[in-house]
């Protein structure tokens, strides 16, 4: 078997195992990523609906403004599941058994990352459909949906890398749980909830360097149907930078773990 075929086989093996594990606990695997985003579009958009009366607010409804952020929030709540599973494999010795087969370490990581992307894309589509059902306007077409999914996949790969770095470094599931509230400062210091022009100056500065701002803005343009490919380019640059930072850290942490064992 060629190296490429072996790598593809190993990656597929890990992906199928991850899917099988998720089917045994579908609520945590597929339900958890959509709970808070659905709360955002179903409750928060109603509570803060009058914010559109503020002069300069650029959307016709708060739901229209918040829906793209809720769509991308699925990645922030979907991340950590596979990283927790990998830490469990380390603790139980299953990772050692995989290495004896042998399964490529890169395939182990890639298979789990692909599973994370699949889970989050499904969750994102559910939230997008729910947003439109609740009344969020969607002015785009099929290509705009594809653009939104690309942005979501990039954000998922970048954000989930944080969990792999912490999990593989600490080998502790409890340490991973500490990262869950990280979505709060990241989303608050962005354009997710209010336009940057209406925020205090220091928040505007923080939002301008926050990659979440750029992916949310891109998703917002795609959802409105007014997107240009430059919007996707900005999201790719922001998401790509985060991916390079976190996934490189995850790869180095995984390599150190394998050497230590």
Regions found by a protein language model. Give the residues of each.
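Aromatic- and glycine-rich beta-strand/loop motifs that create alpha-glucan
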Residues: 1-36
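Short, membrane-interfacial amphipathic segments enriched in basic
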Residues: 1-13, 159, 202-213
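Hydrophobic alpha-helical transmembrane segments of multi-pass membrane transport proteins
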Residues: 39-46, 62-134, 163, 179-182, ...
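Short helix-capping/hinge motifs at transmembrane helix termini and TM-loop junctions
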Residues: 44-53, 77, 131-143, 167-172, ...
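Transmembrane helix segments
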Residues: 48-49, 167-209, 213
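Alpha-helical transmembrane segments and their short interhelical loops
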Residues: 105-181, 227-251
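Membrane-interfacial helix-loop-helix junctions in multi-pass membrane proteins
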Residues: 139, 190-244
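Short cytosolic juxtamembrane segments of multi-pass membrane proteins
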Residues: 254-261
């Amino acid at each position: 078997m060629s190296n490429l075929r072996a790598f593809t086989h190993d990656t597929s093996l890990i992906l199928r195992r991850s899917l099988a594990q998720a089917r045994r606990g579908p609520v945590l695997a597929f339900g958890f990523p959509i709970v808070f985003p659905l709360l955002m579009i179903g409750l928060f958009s109603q509570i803060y609906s009058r914010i559109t009366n503020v002069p300069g607010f650029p959307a016709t409804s708060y739901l229209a403004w918040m829906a793209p952020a809720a769509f991308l929030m699925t990645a922030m709540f979907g991340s950590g599941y596979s990283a927790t599973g990998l830490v469990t494999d380390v603790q139980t010795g299953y990772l050692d058994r995989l290495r004896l087969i042998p399964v490529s370490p890169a395939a182990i990581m890639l298979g789990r990352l692909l599973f994370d992307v699949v889970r989050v894309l499904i969750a994102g589509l559910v939230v997008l459909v729910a947003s439109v059902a609740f009344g969020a306007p969607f002015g785009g077409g099929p290509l705009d949906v594809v653009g939104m999914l690309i942005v979501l996949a990039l954000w998922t790969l970048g954000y989930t890398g944080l969990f792999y770095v912490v999990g593989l470094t600490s080998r502790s599931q409890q340490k991973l749980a500490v990262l869950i509230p990280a979505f709060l400062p990241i989303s608050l210091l962005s354009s997710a909830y209010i336009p940057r022009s209406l925020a205090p100056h220091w928040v505007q500065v923080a939002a301008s360097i926050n990659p979440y701002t750029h992916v949310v803005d891109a998703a917002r343009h795609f959802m409105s149907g007014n997107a240009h490919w430059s919007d996707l380019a900005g999201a790719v640059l922001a998401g790509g930078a985060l991916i390079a930072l976190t996934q490189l850290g995850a790869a180095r942490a995984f390599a150190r773990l394998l050497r230590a064992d």
